[in-house]
Amino acid sequence: QKNDKKDRFYGLM
């Protein structure tokens, strides 16, 4: 999970 923050950000979209 290197882009965990990006995953959460895109998850909201």
UniProtKB/Swiss-Prot annotation:
Coiled coil: none annotated. The modification Methionine amide is found at M13. The modification Pyrrolidone carboxylic acid is found at Q1. It comes from the Eukaryota. Keywords: Amidation, Pyrrolidone carboxylic acid, Secreted. GO terms for cellular component: extracellular region. The keyword rRNA-binding does not apply. InterPro entries: Tachy_Neuro_lke_CS. It is found in: Secreted. The keyword Secreted applies. Disulfide bonds: none annotated. Expressed by the venom gland. Belongs to the tachykinin family. This is Tachykinin-like peptide-XI.
